[in-house]
């Protein structure tokens, strides 16, 4: 029975040693986590002071302005397309007039006077 008691005592001593080691590791981890959390909170506060966030009303105003600018840009693109097509049509018309003028001049030069 002495051997069994010694074995029981050694096992309990080992369990206590492991528990102490585990508790120490946990305490160090919690301490490190707390330290990093505080550091991150300080950094976040520094960033919040450095970069002010816009409130919802201001963000909505910016979004509305962006939508308005997009709409105006689309209208402008439509107008540019219209004027490009008009330019091509006028160019074609001008070429037709040139051809008709040449043909008419030839016709007039052939007719006896």
Swiss-Prot record:
- Give a yes or no for keyword Coiled coil in this entry: yes
Name the domain of life. Eukaryota
Which BP terms does GO give this entry? Answer: endosome organization; regulation of protein localization
Q: Name one Pfam family in it.
A: BLI1
From the UniProt record, list the coiled-coil ranges.
57-97
- A Gene Ontology CC term for this entry? endosome
- Name its cellular compartments: Endosome
Assigned keywords, A-Z: Coiled coil, Endosome, Transport
Q: Which coarse location class applies to the principal site listed for this UniProt protein?
A: other
Q: How does it assemble?
A: Component of the biogenesis of lysosome-related organelles complex-1 (BLOC-1) composed of at least BLI1, BLS1, CNL1, KXD1, SNN1 and VAB2.
Q: What does this protein do?
A: Component of the biogenesis of lysosome-related organelles complex-1 (BLOC-1) involved in endosomal cargo sorting.
Per the record, the similarity remark reads: Belongs to the BLI1 family.
Q: What else is known?
A: Present with 1240 molecules/cell in log phase SD medium.
Under what name is this protein listed? Biogenesis of lysosome-related organelles complex 1 subunit BLI1
Species the sequence originates in = Saccharomyces cerevisiae (strain ATCC 204508 / S288c)
